[in-house]
Amino acid sequence: MKKIAWFILFLVFLMMYSHAVKHVLEGGQRLGVLTKPIKEFALFVTTATEAYSQIKKDHSDDQESGLTAYTKINALDKDLFVLNPTYRKDLNTWRISLYNVKEGTEDLFWDVDESDWIDTEIVPRRRVLRHPILLSDSSIVFIGENTHVIYRVSKSGELMWKARGCRFHHALNPEEEGALWVCTKKESFVKQYEKWGITYEDSGIAKLDISNGEILYEESVSQILFKNNLSGLVLGARNGEQASGHDPLHLNDVQVVVNNSEWMEKGDLFLSLRNRSTIIHFRPSNGKVINVIQGDFIQQHDVDYLNDSLISIFNNNKSGIGPENFFRKNFDDLESNYSLMTSNVHVYDLKNNRFYQPLDSVLSTVGFFTHDQGLHEYLPGVGWALESQNHSQLVIINEDSVIHNGFLALDSDGRKVDMNWSRFYTNLDFLNN
């Protein structure tokens, strides 16, 4: 009888624990101080699996020179400079390098150790630097992704300023009037019924003074959507919670408009919301959402302003259904066979509300795919440049020809240099020295 009693108690405990796990993973807060430990314990296996996968990836990176990753092509007939941050295992530090892709040379570099400027317990390999900008005085501005700090560093490597106060991440884009636009994030709370609510990771945007890092403007993307009667984009779609928590929007780029036209105004912003496969055309001057842009692109990174009526979108083309490693899948057993095999570029014409994909026929032959991160840029006189972060692959397409396909460089140990939110320059005429 005792065994039966213990068994029944065990079943009751399992039922109560299962209900508690379901409650906290759906955003419930009724368990008070127990909410966070129950959630962390429930997600332990997922977190441990992700950590193990990263360790395996790091180990495999150590063994891979990159020489056989893909057929290398370099038919550039003009200079192209790429400013790229990468963790150099041979140097045991993060290095931001300016490469001349045509010549295959490293022309400038900055070795960066964030612990020289801030207190952090994050080991160097995990700090992650992103999206550097080269300025006219040969200083650089860049994001410390996992420390959520923006730095400006002189040509000689001295810290000029650091910006804190927001959790900065992903993209950093300049405005003509000496300002920078950047993605931010914070935890937000939505009250639901009287006794409980939902906490989630909210995306935001911030504008910084490039001369000193002062925050000039800050706004929550959720609040932008709520105020424009678009709450469904925040709360309406039910996807599985990620290990990091509820992240309904996942802003990964903010792109500023530089000219007035019939379809946009100077100072307008295009916001890329990865987890909604949506681009938001937002006007900070009056707080209005001008357009919600959706189409045949999935979990995109990077939206670019092309001209007075065109924008371009880097489409990762990764399914948002299923586990995080669910990509490059064909549903051969279904009547509708939708292929997720190639990342590409979508150009959207605001004038006639149409999309077209200018690079599909070429990219399908290259085998270009990155299931996360990645970016692109149209470079007049050169062509389209595309970065696959997962494969450290730089593809450049001019008309219907691939004029570059390969990695940027090899380090001193023969490993390919990773690409990590690079920036492209067709010339360096803007430098004062």
Predicted regions and their residues:
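Histidine-/acidic-rich catalytic cores in large beta-rich domains
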Residues: 5-433
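Cytosolic-side transmembrane helix boundary signature
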Residues: 1-2
